[in-house]
């Protein structure tokens, strides 16, 4: 499996703190960026719109009521086919979920990005807690991750993980 990091205009849609990921893609965080700056650096400064789908019947286009298209607003990229009750969880909301905890010193921004041409997105924060060791030299780090599928195939997911998520191989 490849990393599946999205590239828009030759620019990887990912940010990271600390060590450069194995794939060498993304933009290094300095540690003082705001949530909005990180969202922009990660190429996640766009929204998802829900648009109707149509089918051709007897030469005329008729709205198809059982599904809609999820579409990225900045470039009209089709992200998926979703049900009529599906509501997008915007990238900005993902960062807003973590913002109060980062601002209060409970965690710090670590990685964020877009996979599969914008269909999947994630944001990872490292908790400001002491790392654990199961055995000497085997350090366990503590992260919180929020991931989301704009393609209608993955619900919003929040969880804790000891894994530094930097690509599709480790997440979603």
Stretches with model-predicted labels:
Residues 1-97, 106:
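Feature for intrinsically disordered/low-complexity regulatory segments and propeptides
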Residues 93-172:
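Intrinsic disorder/low-complexity polar-acidic segments
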């Amino acid at each position: 499996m490849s990393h599946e990091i999205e590239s828009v205009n030759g620019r990887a849609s990912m940010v990271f703190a600390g060590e450069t990921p194995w794939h060498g893609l993304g933009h290094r965080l300095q540690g003082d960026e705001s949530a909005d700056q990180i969202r922009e650096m990660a190429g996640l400064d766009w929204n998802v719109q829900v648009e109707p789908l149509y089918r051709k019947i007897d030469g005329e286009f008729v709205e198809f009521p059982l599904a809609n298209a999820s579409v990225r607003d900045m470039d009209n990229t089709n992200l998926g086919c979703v049900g009529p009750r599906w509501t997008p969880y915007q990238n900005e909301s993902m960062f807003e979920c973590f913002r109060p905890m980062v601002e209060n010193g409970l965690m710090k921004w670590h990685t964020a990005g877009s996979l599969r041409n914008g269909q999947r997105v994630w944001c990872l924060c490292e908790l400001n807690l002491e790392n654990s060791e199961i055995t000497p030299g085997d350090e366990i780090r503590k992260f919180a991750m929020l991931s989301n599928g704009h393609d209608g195939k993955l619900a919003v997911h929040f969880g804790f993980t000891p894994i530094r998520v930097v690509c599709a191989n480790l997440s979603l």
